[in-house]
Curated annotation (Swiss-Prot):
SUPFAM superfamilies: S-adenosyl-L-methionine-dependent methyltransferases. Keywords: Methyltransferase, S-adenosyl-L-methionine, Transferase, tRNA processing. This is tRNA (guanine-N(7)-)-methyltransferase. The keyword S-adenosyl-L-methionine applies. One of its GO terms (cellular component) is tRNA methyltransferase complex. It is an enzyme of class 2 (transferase). Pfam families: Methyltransf_4. Belongs to the class I-like SAM-binding methyltransferase superfamily. TrmB family. It comes from the Bacteria. Its EC number is 2.1.1.33. It catalyses: guanosine(46) in tRNA + S-adenosyl-L-methionine = N(7)-methylguanosine(46) in tRNA + S-adenosyl-L-homocysteine. GO terms for molecular function: tRNA (guanine(46)-N7)-methyltransferase activity.
Amino acid sequence: MTETRGARATEAFFGRRKGKPLRERQAAHLENLLPELKIDLEHAAPADLKELFPVSVERVRLEIGFGGGEHLIHRAAEDPATGFIGVEPFVNSMAKLLGQIEAKAIRNIRLHDDDATQVLDWLPAASVDQIDLLYPDPWPKRKHWKRRFVSEVNLDRFARILRPGGVFCFASDIDSYINWTLIHCRDHAAFEWTAAGAADWLAPFAGWPSTRYEAKARREGRSSAYLSFRRS
């Protein structure tokens, strides 16, 4: 436990953040629906994470920082056999996703509305099949690069919770962050970049739904990279 606290002491903490005022229905979703879907970190995680879900699932996938929720809701709807855990501290984004979950009657999503490292440290070892980190905050200034979510400490966390053969997927339109992630994963013994050629990282992931972040990057003339790393 001391080791975990020490690691966290060097990390930037991202708590609940709020933007523009919520609509009445969005506020109601946060008050009534979120408590039903939120994972309870006060109790130990079940040895089998499939027990977190009210429906039968065959595998578990974690998305860190789901933003507008387009990707998470699309994946959950197209793949009901997978249980999804979505983490997002931004209140407005969480409220938006909750509305989509209700509208589409999605039952294979559980949520956390605070720091993702709390979830990473809570999850059992070798319990997750895939981790998605898509268009994370790039912290573009060099002096802030240490705040990027991809770090040796967090890759250790990923390696602990991913099953052997599990996948870490990363997408970004910021060249310095793409290179940063490639270097960090190359230097980590637990991860192997799966790309065999340029098409493997320039083309979106299979079944990828376009997101507003990706669309913004294209409008501003930036191309994206889609990196996959296999847990050894």
